[in-house]
């Protein structure tokens, strides 16, 4: 049985999603239903982002900078190391623009080395990063019963624990 989450507590976060395929979209739906504020979604396939944005009542960002600018917490659900490094690139459109005080929860299937690079890049701009490796499927993403293996600083984990509990 999924843990009951207090909706009042959930309003303190403004959450953005990068990667709204089957996993990311279902994670966004789940958080929205549990009372979290999902402010924006982004996908390289804009039609997919627009569809989920309309469904859950948020914005479909056209740039990664827009996601960071409108979110306290950004959850990334992309496919591989190359995609992850691309969304956190040092130049051009990137989640690192205006990222000071943003917390990133990276749920992508990527190598440990890439997680370390991303954490260093985030910290360099005043942001925080948490690794949130998933060992579950689409149904668990939708139902809020994901198995997440988290890595990162305890203070970052504690800050976003209500989100992690809901996922």
Stretches found by the model and what they are:
Residues 15, 110-167:
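Rossmann-fold dinucleotide-binding core
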Residues 18, 63, 93, 135-138:
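Short beta-strand/turn micro-motifs at beta-sheet edges
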Residues 64-128:
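Rossmann-fold NAD(P) dinucleotide-binding segment
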